[in-house]
Amino acid sequence: ILAYCAFVIFMYLLYHILTLVSTCSKADFFTFFGEVQKKDGHSACMCTCWNMTDEENYCEIEAPVARGEKNLRTATKQAAEKLIDEGRLGGYLAYASGTPIGWCNANDKSCYPRLMSAHPSMEGQVKCIMCFEVLPDHRNCGVASALLRHICDDARRAGYTCVEAYPNKCNMLSENDYEHMVHIYREAGFLCESRNNQDVWVKKIKEEKI
């Protein structure tokens, strides 16, 4: 029964995922992270970390907070809004009954300045997946898998040659989270490559039409 319910939710979500590419969905982005803050209490970064240079992070978040000009949440929200407006922070929101319940930070590799130095790009266009976040009430229901499938399909339509993911243990809340994400990537056809002593999960995108 549980497996069937998960499958039904999975299929439903496949058609209720929106690409965060314009200001029209900013409200849903911040609504979602507001819920994460209330239910999990760990949404401080709002997925801005990898999209900012060290200098930007210091000038726009760390310094204003240290000077007492802004609290961390306000500074981070303003930084996230700027990144979205500039097209540097992008990703996908999953919805249930019109409410955002899941998020994945995924975009062109050039949008992640910190990542570019740690994981040099392969030839051709590369779409990167940085992190997933799902509201507690909707976890273990296939939300992340639905998002991942949609991202790979979207990357294929956009002409990307591959999708890369970096489920580093130090970025996960627990060992179980890491193992769970590795399982999801493996099930989606990703293969593990070792680069600079770190695991990178890669899915080659075929040129065939879908």
Q: What residue spans do the PLM features occupy?
A:
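C-terminal "cap" of GNAT-fold acetyltransferases
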Residues: 176-210
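Conserved acetyl-CoA-binding loop-helix of GNAT-fold acetyltransferases
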Residues: 134, 140-156
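Conserved acyl-donor/pantetheine-binding loop and adjacent beta-alpha core of acyl/acetyltransferases
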Residues: 78, 82-89, 95, 99-131, ...
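Conserved N-terminal entry element of GNAT/NAT acetyltransferase domains
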Residues: 8, 14-63, 208-210
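Active-site rim helix/loop that mediates acceptor-substrate recognition in acyltransferases
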Residues: 45-90
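Conserved GNAT acetyl-CoA-binding A-motif
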Residues: 155-175
